[in-house]
Amino acid sequence: LKHGIPTVSRFGGLLELKDKKPMRFVEIIMYDGTSIDPLEIFIRSGMTNYMGAIKTGNGKIGASFREFPAHSRDMVEQLADRLKRIGLGGLVKIGLPGQSLLDIPVNEGRIGAIVIGGLNPMSIFEETGVRTYSRALAGLIDFKRLFRYEEMEDRLREFL
């Protein structure tokens, strides 16, 4: 968003890897159909195989599918390269305008992109029998609990 690229997050899913290459989504949950992060569901359900993905290049990892305007493809690629250089390479694959990406249809005038899910490292714990409690940085809150950011310092003083 900082770079003026409007993004549509379509779904979170389990991305199957073979020989370290993304093959297909084997499960998906549309973001507009849940208030829980789909990756949390897949991890807690024991559906991931992140250990296999990092050890052999074959497994199932959490990933999300995003869409960007087609004219922003070059900028998205540049940003992905910059992030990768500093160790934050999360974009797995970027599609072509109006073309399906891993058999997922993309709206006309848009490109698809697959982004590695941030909760994936937590799946290692679950896969090895260590129960975890994690929540994505999203959720619902009662509107009455919100306040202006200028009040933050005073509110923090109440707790210190």
Predicted ranges, named:
Residues K2-L160:
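Anaerobic metallocofactor- and corrinoid-dependent redox/one-carbon enzyme cores
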